[in-house]
């Protein structure tokens, strides 16, 4: 019997980046190497480093375990550091994710909630 790996769960992302490509100045596109940052890695950096949330809270928001979040943030930081230190572009794309639903105001029994 062949063991197959457990399927990856979809991670929840609360923000779709508007800009998906960052390039260092002074290097031609033809000479440029890239680091690809997955959208779920981008979300991990946004939650932890930009918003300053605790890892447990970030993991809950993304609907993943805390150890999985830890691996995700380490991978993202490594890719960002590699791009900055080695003069690479950063492309944000791909990954296994769904955009988190945004709660909106609604109507209930003729009254605004």
Predicted regions and their residues:
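Short alpha-helical "packing" element that flanks the helix-turn-helix/winged-helix DNA-binding module
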Residues: 41-45
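Short, Lys/Arg-enriched N-terminal segment that forms or immediately precedes the first helix
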Residues: 18-33
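Residues within the DNA-recognition helix of helix-turn-helix
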Residues: 72-75
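Helix-turn-helix DNA-binding motif, specifically the short coil turn and the N-cap/start of the second
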Residues: 54, 63-67
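C-terminal flanking helix
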Residues: 77-84
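The alpha-helix within a helix-turn-helix
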Residues: 48, 59
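Helix-turn-helix/homeodomain-like alpha-helical modules used for DNA recognition
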Residues: 98-113
